[in-house]
Curated annotation (Swiss-Prot):
The protein's Enzyme Commission number: 3.6.1.40
Pfam families named among the record's database cross-references: Ppx-GppA, Ppx-GppA_III
HAMAP family per the UniProt record, alphabetical: GppA
Pathway linked to the protein: Purine metabolism; ppGpp biosynthesis; ppGpp from GTP: step 2/2
Native source organism of the sequence: Pectobacterium atrosepticum (strain SCRI 1043 / ATCC BAA-672) (Erwinia carotovora subsp. atroseptica)
Function: Catalyzes the conversion of pppGpp to ppGpp. Guanosine pentaphosphate (pppGpp) is a cytoplasmic signaling molecule which together with ppGpp controls the 'stringent response', an adaptive process that allows bacteria to respond to amino acid starvation, resulting in the coordinated regulation of numerous cellular activities.
Record protein name field: Guanosine-5'-triphosphate,3'-diphosphate pyrophosphatase
Length: 498
């Protein structure tokens, strides 16, 4: 039974939506128990004098009535409620906040834009893998936050008064998706970014992470259309052209774009186009968490792990009682194989990390049943919360585990979008071989195997006499050679001269 003392909640009164995150602390991380979101569009209720309309406030209060029931089970000192851009701006914010605090029975903190950027950065730092030096971008309903940092430490925090709701009302109020509206929206956003662009570019970040509904929508679109998960300027421009062809906001249809996100998608897209151009961003990926996760981790006072993915994999190993020594054995072998073929097969550090991750949890399916354990492993990975891994990376891990033994199914390898198909196939081949060679579960039985690449053909060179001395693994390798040949992956076995 869950103890209420292990429960934490964070509420974000945003300009477009109100969100509540309910979690519990587990093994130095947080486990999500509930996410509740209601489209309140508070910013749309601001008039020219920045007064909130009664209708907008009523929408907000009704939403908080829903939230308040869930909060009754959580200690008050383990709940944080913050308000952002619209309530920073509204001249009658006190009227809204007084009633809101009565409904929740909790204080509500109207945070500054810089504090919002800091919390967003912390949420990303605790949940998102990749290089330590990062730029974080969050396009909200009424403001856009930009934060740079290294590890857990922020180096620059910026909040700009432009958001997908305010830009919708300002530049797409006629509901026309014409090129002129996009141009005006982009130019206005670029103008707002110019005073801070140079200093942001100088921070030396290695990775750009997006933590907003706009970026989430883009990720869903790209997955639905079979693209890889990396957001780039050409992809954004392609989507803009598609939107322009739709002519009207009500007629906007893009594969993967949900009706819920469609209304503010063009305005968010215009802002993101401006950010990419002004900051010279090459690629962006989706964050694993943002403001609400930052609030929860702040209450827990947990340090930011140097390697979030390692923490996630270690948590899975403990939860499912995996043999960590065997995982390490397979990982070491697979890494050795990868380094031998990396140049010929163009396998970079990203491939190396994903292969290592698959090795660390390759036996997770055994926790359900030996029979069909690869399918069980794929299911568990596909449906687990894996901080540090993007949705596309989760899908690739599941696909690799599904294909770790037995006949090879090429379809899921071609349908994943974390890596080019040929790289994913090469990782699959190396994982399968490492599992075979490590099958006796002892370090002293691992042979010194040399790998030679000849196009797509892979030649394994074993110590003299090894195949005769190890008949079971020799038979497994012969079977593996046949299975790989069925999918046109030539695999040859030979022994070095005595």
């Amino acid at each position: 039974m869950l103890s209420s003392s292990s429960l934490y909640a964070a509420i974000d009164l945003g300009s477009n939506s109100f969100h509540m995150l309910v979690t519990r602390e587990t093994a130095g991380s947080i486990q999500t128990l509930a996410k509740i979101k209601r489209k309140v569009r508070l910013a749309a209720g601001l008039d020219k004098q920045n007064r909130l309309s009664q209708e907008a406030m009523q929408r907000g209060w009704q939403c908080l009535q829903l939230f308040s029931e869930r909060l009754q089970d959580i200690p008050q000192d383990q709940v944080r409620v913050v308000a952002t851009a619209t309530l920073r701006l509204a001249t009658n914010a006190d009227e809204f906040l007084q009633r809101a605090q009565e409904i929740l029975g909790l204080p509500i903190q109207v945070i500054s834009g810089e504090e919002e950027a800091r919390l967003i950065y912390q949420g990303v730092a605790h949940t998102t893998g990749g290089p330590d030096a990062r730029l974080v971008v969050d396009i909200g309903g009424g403001s856009t936050e930009l934060a740079t940092g290294i590890g857990a430490k922020t180096t620059q925090l910026i909040s700009l008064p432009m958001g997908c709701v305010t830009w919708l009302d300002r530049y797409f109020s006629d509901r026309n998706l014409e090129a002129g509206n996009f141009e005006r929206a982009e130019n206005a956003a670029r103008e707002m970014l110019r005073p801070v662009a140079a200093s942001l570019r100088e921070q030396g970040w290695q990775i750009c992470v997006g933590a907003s509904g706009t970026v989430q929508a883009l990720q869903e679109i790209m997955v639905a259309q079979g693209m890889d998960e990396y957001i780039t300027l050409p992809k954004l421009r392609q989507l803009k052209e598609h939107a322009i062809q739709c002519d009207k906001l009500e007629e906007l249809e893009i594969d993967g774009l949900t009706l819920e996100r469609a209304l503010v998608f063009p305005s968010g897209l215009a802002i993101l186009l401006a950010i990419f151009q002004e900051l010279d961003i090459k690629t962006m990926t989706l964050a694993g968490g943002a403001l609400r996760e930052g609030l929860v981790y702040g209450m827990l006072h947990l340090p930011v792990d140097q390697d979030i993915r390692h923490r996630t994999l270690a948590t899975l190993q403990r939860r499912y009682l995996l043999d960590t020594e065997q995982a390490k054995r397979v990982s070491t072998l697979a890494d050795n194989f990868l380094q031998q073929v990396a140049r010929d097969w163009q396998l970079d550090s990203r491939c190396r990390e994903l292969l290592r991750s698959a090795c660390m949890v390759h036996e997770i399916g055994l926790s359900i049943d030996f029979r069909q354990s690869p399918q069980h492993a794929a299911y568990l990975i596909r449906h687990s919360d894996l901080p540090g891994f993007t949705p596309a990376q989760k899908k690739l891990l599941a696909t690799l585990l599904q294909n770790q033994i037995n006949p090879i199914d090429l379809m899921p390898l071609s349908q994943q979008n974390a890596l080019p198909v040929n790289q994913a196939q090469h990782l699959c081949r190396l994982l399968r071989l490492a599992i075979i060679f490590a099958s006796r579960r002892r370090d002293d039985t691992l042979p010194a195997v040399r790998l030679r690449v000849e196009g797509e053909a892979l030649r394994l060179i074993l110590p003299a006499g090894w195949l005769a001395q190890h008949p079971l693994r020799a038979e497994m390798l012969e079977q593996e050679s046949r299975w790989q040949s069925y999918v046109h992956w030539p695999l040859m076995l030979e022994e070095a001269p005595a």
